[in-house]
């Protein structure tokens, strides 16, 4: 409702351009080197730099987006991530922590230590359950019972305004290949299970590439339903410059074999509208119609601005033509007519294959190129009953990577329990 109110206010005011979501990158340091990500290469000269906490909070106030997506880099590495999350929540903003999942359990253990010190009777049953389900070790439980190492430091606690947004690009084998490390998928599953037990909201984000098996994505969503995951976002893999250069130079691979063209996106997303009815996808049905090739949209990258260590990134999350000191300068000085695809013609060659969510979802949300019935369609999609998949895939299909190779069926079964 907060986002709906934000949209209505700007429409009544006749605002030409405004932010709907802030992509906040407080740092670009990461603990993984994912295939298809160009951030590390693009910002290689400033990998050790971080945004001051004050600048992060000021950026949210400056653009006044109702939702902030904290990304990077890996945001849980940011030294003041707890203060940042709590600061944004105090501003009454919806917060998504976009994480690879590797540090999630660590941050939740910090939360448990503070909670146990305050309400041991309430937290003890949770600790017992987490221990029984192998989500905490006995030594971790004992450490939690000793209380927080730094009692004055804030923690990330469950909130109706916050989501863990976990990156998952497929089932175990596929995801571990893409993030270039075995065991990451398994850790994500453990972290999501722990989060749901503790009362956190959990979402996932998935990028579809040329070699992605669409059936595998459906199995992924069906499996995540057994964990109680609240919803998903899904977007096509776009061949932006930094990612292409990283793939070619670091991995010696041809980006054309990995990323999607516009035509290939439509082929991969042919069932997108069906997914919207079967799975709890976040966003709009209008965007799903767009990626399925059923309608046209123009890019509105100005609605999802990116703020990072160098300033306000222009023109969008993927393309970099410069950085601006203020949000106002970004909105007023960028010639937005130079970008996007209009009537099948790319205004900029780099935009030709882009159909990504952060460029086109806001167009669907705001109602650009709207059709009769779109508003009610979007309202029902977001506020009506959420679909819950009934099919539950065999754990052997889900854990088809290092788990299968290690041949540990007992451990596999524990992880698979919802």
Q: PLM features: residue spans?
A:
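Conserved residues at the C-terminal ends of beta-strands
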Residues: 40, 71, 167, 235, ...
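Alpha-helix N-cap/loop-to-helix initiation residues
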Residues: 77-78, 104-105, 210-213, 323
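Conserved alpha-helical substructure of the radical SAM core
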Residues: 1-161, 367, 409-410, 418
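Short glycine/proline- and charge-enriched loop/turn segments
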Residues: 38-42, 172, 247-254, 330-335
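Residue-level marker for beta-strand->alpha-helix junctions and adjacent short loops that shape enzyme
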Residues: 44, 75, 102, 171, ...
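Radical SAM enzyme [4Fe-4S]-AdoMet core and its adjacent flexible, acidic
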Residues: 51, 94, 121-126, 130-133, ...
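The −1 position to Zn-ligating cysteines in a subset of zinc-ribbon hairpins
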Residues: 29, 33, 298, 350-353
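Flexible mid-to-C-terminal extensions adjoining Fe-S/redox cofactors in radical SAM and related proteins
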Residues: 18, 313-418
